[in-house]
Amino acid sequence: GLGDVYKRQHRTVHTALPTAILSGAILTVAGLTYSETFLIMMGTPDTVLPLSTVYMRIIFCGVTFNMVYNFCASILRAAGDTKSPLVFLLFAGILNVILNLVFVIQFQMNVAGVALATIISQAVSAVLVVIALMRRTDACKLYLNKLRFYKPQLAKILRIGLPAGIQSALFAISN
């Protein structure tokens, strides 16, 4: 009945966030470990390899924020709130530009500053989207103390999300 639907939605929301965090952590470790190898495989010129490696390693430190934003924004959109994720992304984009200027011009941080600005902006968008879920009044309301892996929901998230994620990654690599 309706109670079962609510329960499944509630469990999906509370499985999605830990899944995003765990996925992000795994990708961060892989990225930090293999950034230079990936860049060499892509044919990055030796002249820019050191700076590219710095940039990529810093960016990989923020992958978890990106995963949290994407998972939670998808939940909001599925629940009918398409505006909030867009507003949060717009705010994060403006913040990114401002932080780029501050870190690069004011603090002379160059490539590291650009990467740091990006992950700070991603962190802000992730926090905003989590707060939006915590303020909901429906089955998508997020309670931090109820986060866990519910096996049926995790299986469905992985069954649907893993192929889509691999497809997106392959598309990004090919371009």
Outline where the language-model segments fall:
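Interfacial transmembrane-helix starts/ends
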Residues: 8-22, 30, 34, 53-56, ...
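Membrane-interface helix-loop junctions in multi-pass transport and translocation proteins
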Residues: 93-127, 131
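Residues that define the loop-to-transmembrane-helix transition and helix capping
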Residues: 14, 82-83, 111-112
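Alpha-helical transmembrane segments of multi-pass membrane proteins
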Residues: 46-69
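Membrane-interface junctions at transmembrane-helix termini in multi-pass inner-membrane proteins
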Residues: 65-89
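Residue-level recognition of transmembrane alpha-helices
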Residues: 20, 56-59, 63, 89-93, ...
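Short, small-residue-biased leader/transition segments that mark boundaries at the very start
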Residues: 2-6
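Interhelical loop/hinge segments that connect adjacent transmembrane helices in multipass membrane
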Residues: 118, 129-172
